[in-house]
């Protein structure tokens, strides 16, 4: 049977298209060569097969067509049409000769495929071969579909009787072809799941028919000749790149990824296809706003509202799976828009359980709105229909939970006590937070489906939540928020006006239906007794009040809300209660007024008592001053009598001729050094009589309990007179003491020298910045405001008289000049203070590892101290003495006490004989 007879049996274009679309790929194995005489081209590789057939019989096509026309009685018009078809096949052959030559150099796998293709056209081109006629062969109908005269997807869509929805097994491919290049496009979308049309790596085709290998060797030479002869004309034919199909992606991902070109141009175009598909796939990833999951399955699909763009699982929202669950963007076969309950009712709801305004809502039986996630996680919330999660019932929950706890995760503290807060499910944890706040931080969890738990929804705080689960949930939440912000704008741009009008019309129908059902449904049951609820627990009320304050010009920032959870005061009564129209708040308000009256009366009584005590203190101070004057007179008389007694005692010793022991009465009393115990520490009584000390700054002697002794200058200061003022007494330890700011300023030069040895000067510069600025102008001022009297002693002069002689005082009458000279004299020896040797171990050292005692002036290593230290025990504002000096001072105090006791005993013995 020659080629001309086959050409006469070519079907019309419409019939060929219907045959191609109704074709079932599962019947390939039963299709014989003899049954395929009705079609000439192929669907997937018709261009290639046609080119190879024309290459095998390019010289005798016209003769064979004429002979067949004479035998069958075809008229001249039919012969002319067949000759035109011959010319078209020759053009197709020339356009694909380069691809055929490239396949020849592809390896053994390519040669097998070409051999099979040559064996397919061998029964058509040479009918004289007995082996081919005697043995029928199978062929792949997907590779030999009728050749279509369409080059782009748009031309197919223009046909009235074509429906792209039903053609799930067909997709045009792209490639640089001319003329009938659409046959190459059909190859990718023809439902082909094997690798027959790939680069030549098909092993299944060889296994199906082993006899094809013998024919491959026989016909390989013919293919080589035809491809080599046509390769010269390949450069003259321009190529066109077919338009890329950017339709909805579906489950044909494997076909798209496995379909490869047979030329370099097709390879480049196919490399762009997976990238485009992956970018489209990433753009369509949806996240459920209830569980934050992104897994969408057929049984539980993620659907999206066509109005507000919110995304949710069907199971998470209680969609029944009927027509209302089909959404235009959720499935490629869906045509009905879907809307959430809030959009159906045409409201912008506010949740009653939390301050968040995002997410998806459900309506309560009382006409309020709550988040679905809030209704699932808040204890006490019930559903009328468990499967559909509606309506939500809030009456079963105790109303005392509203505003009872403060949310620890709220971004705006003004909404921290709105709604209902849940607690952390980790044992005795006392963390409370809103459900949506916990969802924002990724703290919500849900038990697995196989676990049988009464309440499968639980939440943990940041401390007890799993770090990895929290991380991916937090990312999904942020991705969901960013997607919701841009989804509406993108959808409006992508939708056509007709689709937008269809969605708007459908939404109006839903809203009319919802309005009708709202008016006809029975009224929900509510308890007879009205339950009070704090107004401040409603987030919507707080927003309206804030808006009112803004319109009135009142700033809400100047009224900070004190939400500290202090349940009771010192006397056991509640310190603060949220304002509400309840009996508890009324009782609290009345009790607070009574307490305020009592406190005010107490303040008046304390003021009167203070005035009375101050008047008594003034009288006592006057008596004290008189006693001090008499004490000075008695001390002078006592000194004179002591000197006379000593002279008489020495005279008596001279008369006796031997040295007599001077009695304790005639001995001059030693000046007792004030110890650290005299700094006002309670519970330590001294043998000396109590004295009233005056402040070194204000020169007043009131508030003796607030006077602090400086261990360097031995002056007392009020805590409030210091710079900066102190709020409590400084702590004095065993080996440290306290000094005032001016003494510390003078002794800080030693620390500055040590700081200079550090590698960086950060601490030194910081030390210089911290120095008090108010003392610098006093030292640098050239003229003093008021000359100081020589006998007086002020705060600025308390260290001048310690290291200055009388000659310097005569030479420098002005105190300001003495101050400058004294500071110079004091700094010189401290600048030369270099510590080189440890007193304990006699080892070398420097200022970085040695510390000097402020009394004995000896140096010690930090590690040689008892106990050893890692850093200097000298702190800023405090001095330091070694352990030996501290022990010796305590021994001196004990010896002095013993001596005083002995003096008292001798005095008592001398008074007895009298």
Swiss-Prot record:
Amino-acid positions noted as binding Zn(2+) 8 in the UniProt annotation, renumbered to this chain: 838, 841, 861, 864
Outcome recorded upon mutating residue 314 to R: Loss of binding to histone H3
Keyword Coiled coil: yes
Biased composition (Low complexity): 53-68
Entry binding sites for Zn(2+) 7: 710, 713, 740, 743
Residue ranges with Acidic residues bias: 155-168, 191-233, 894-914
Biased composition regions of type Basic residues, renumbered to the chain: 792-802
Residues annotated for Zn(2+) 2 binding in this entry: 305, 308, 340, 343
Positions that bind Zn(2+) 5: 424, 429, 461, 464
Residues binding Zn(2+) 3, per UniProt: 351, 354, 371, 374
Stored SUPFAM superfamilies: FYVE/PHD zinc finger (SSF57903)
Keywords: Coiled coil, Metal-binding, Nucleus, Repeat, Transcription, Transcription regulation, Zinc, Zinc-finger
UniProt xrefs under PANTHER family: PHD FINGER PROTEIN 14, PHD FINGER PROTEINS
Free-text comment about domains: The N-terminal region, including the PHD-type 1 and 2 zinc fingers and the C2HC pre-PHD-type zinc finger, is required for binding to histone H3.
Name under which the protein is recorded: PHD finger protein 14
Organism: Danio rerio (Zebrafish)
């Amino acid at each position: 049977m020659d080629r001309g007879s086959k050409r006469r049996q070519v079907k019309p274009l419409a019939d060929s298209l219907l045959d191609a679309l109704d074709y079932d790929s599962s019947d390939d194995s039963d299709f014989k060569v003899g049954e395929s005489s009705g079609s000439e081209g192929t669907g997937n590789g018709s261009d290639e097969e046609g080119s190879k057939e024309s290459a095998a019989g390019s010289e005798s096509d016209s003769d064979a067509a004429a002979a067949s026309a004479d035998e069958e009685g075809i008229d001249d018009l039919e012969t002319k049409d067949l000759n035109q078809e011959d010319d078209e096949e020759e053009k197709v052959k020339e356009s694909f000769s380069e691809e055929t030559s490239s396949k020849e150099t592809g390896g053994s796998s390519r040669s097998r495929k070409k051999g099979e293709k040559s064996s397919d056209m061998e029964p058509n081109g040479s009918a004289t071969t007995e082996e081919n006629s005697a043995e029928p062969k199978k062929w792949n109908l997907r590779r030999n579909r009728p050749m279509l005269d369409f080059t782009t997807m748009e031309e197919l869509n223009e046909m009235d009787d074509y429906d792209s929805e039903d053609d799930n097994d067909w997709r045009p491919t792209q490639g640089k072809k001319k003329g009938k290049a659409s046959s190459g496009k059909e190859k990718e979308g023809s439902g082909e799941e094997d690798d027959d049309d790939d680069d030549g790596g098909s092993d299944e085709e060889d296994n199906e028919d082993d006899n094809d290998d013998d024919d491959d060797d026989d016909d390989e030479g013919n293919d080589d000749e035809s491809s080599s002869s046509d390769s010269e004309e390949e450069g003259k034919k321009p190529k066109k790149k077919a338009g890329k199909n950017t339709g909805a992606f579906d489950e044909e991902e494997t076909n798209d990824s496995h379909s490869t070109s047979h030329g370099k141009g097709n390879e480049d175009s196919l490399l762009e296809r997976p990238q485009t598909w992956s970018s489209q796939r990433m753009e369509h990833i949806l996240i459920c706003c209830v569980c934050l999951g992104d897994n969408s399955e057929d049984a539980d699909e993620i659907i999206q509202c066509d109005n507000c763009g919110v995304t949710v699982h069907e199971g998470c929202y209680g969609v029944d799976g009927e027509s209302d669950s089909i959404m235009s963007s959720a499935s490629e076969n869906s045509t009905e828009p879907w809307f959430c309950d809030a959009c159906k009712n045409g409201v912008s709801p506010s949740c009653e359980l939390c301050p968040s305004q995002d997410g998806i809502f459900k309506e309560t039986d009382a006409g309020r709105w709550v988040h679905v996630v809030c209704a699932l996680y808040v204890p006490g919330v019930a559903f009328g229909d468990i499967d559909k999660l509606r309506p939500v019932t809030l009456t079963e929950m105790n109303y005392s939970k509203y505003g009872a706890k403060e949310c620890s995760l709220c971004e705006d503290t003004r909404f921290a006590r709105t709604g209902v807060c849940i607690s952390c499910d980790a044992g005795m944890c006392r963390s409370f937070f809103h459900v949506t706040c916990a969802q924002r931080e990724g703290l919500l969890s849900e038990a697995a489906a196989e676990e049988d738990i009464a309440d499968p929804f639980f939440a943990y705080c940041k401390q007890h939540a799993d770090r990895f689960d929290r991380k991916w949930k937090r990312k999904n939440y942020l991705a969901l928020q960013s997607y919701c912000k841009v989804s509406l704008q993108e959808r409006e741009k992508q939708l056509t006006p007709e689709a937008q009008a269809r969605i708007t019309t459908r939404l109006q129908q839903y809203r009319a239906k919802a309005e009708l059902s709202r008016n006809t449904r029975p009224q929900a049951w509510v308890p007879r007794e009205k339950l009070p609820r704090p107004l401040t627990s409603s987030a919507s009320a707080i927003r309206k009040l804030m808006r009112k304050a803004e319109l009135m010009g009142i700033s809400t920032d100047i009224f900070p809300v004190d939400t500290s959870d202090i349940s009771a005061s010192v006397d056991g009564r509640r310190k603060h209660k949220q304002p509400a129209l309840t009996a508890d708040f009324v009782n609290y308000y009345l009790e607070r007024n009574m307490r305020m009256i009592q406190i005010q009366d107490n303040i008046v009584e304390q003021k009167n008592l203070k005035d009375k005590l101050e008047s008594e203190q003034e009288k006592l101070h006057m008596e004290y001053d008189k006693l001090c004057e008499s004490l000075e007179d008695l001390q002078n008389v006592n000194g004179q009598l002591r000197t006379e007694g000593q002279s008489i005692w020495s005279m008596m010793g001279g008369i006796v001729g031997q040295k007599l022991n001077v009695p304790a009465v005639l001995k001059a009393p030693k000046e007792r050094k004030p110890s650290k115990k005299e700094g006002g520490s309670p519970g330590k009584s001294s043998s000396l009589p109590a004295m009233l000390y005056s402040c070194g700054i204000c020169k007043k002697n009131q508030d003796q309990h607030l006077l602090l002794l400086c261990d360097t200058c031995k002056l007392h200061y009020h805590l409030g007179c210091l710079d900066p003022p102190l709020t409590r007494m400084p702590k004095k330890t065993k080996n440290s003491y306290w000094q005032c700011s001016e003494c510390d300023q003078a002794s800080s030069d030693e620390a500055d020298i040590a700081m200079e040895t550090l590698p960086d000067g950060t601490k030194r510069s910081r030390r210089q910045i911290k120095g008090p600025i108010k003392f610098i102008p006093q030292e640098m001022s050239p003229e003093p405001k008021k000359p100081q009297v020589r006998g007086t002693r002020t705060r600025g002069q308390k260290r001048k008289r310690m290291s200055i002689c009388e000659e310097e005082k005569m030479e420098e009458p002005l105190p300001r000049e003495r101050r400058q000279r004294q500071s110079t004299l004091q700094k010189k020896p401290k600048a030369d203070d270099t510590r080189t040797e440890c007193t304990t171990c006699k080892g070398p050292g420097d200022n970085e590892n040695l510390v000097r005692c402020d009394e004995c002036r000896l140096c010690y290593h930090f590690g040689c101290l008892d106990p050893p230290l890692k850093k200097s025990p000298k702190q800023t504002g405090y001095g330091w003495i070694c352990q030996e000096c501290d022990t010796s001072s305590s021994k001196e105090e004990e010896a002095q006490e013993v001596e005083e006791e002995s003096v008292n005993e001798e005095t008592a013995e001398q008074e007895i004989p009298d």
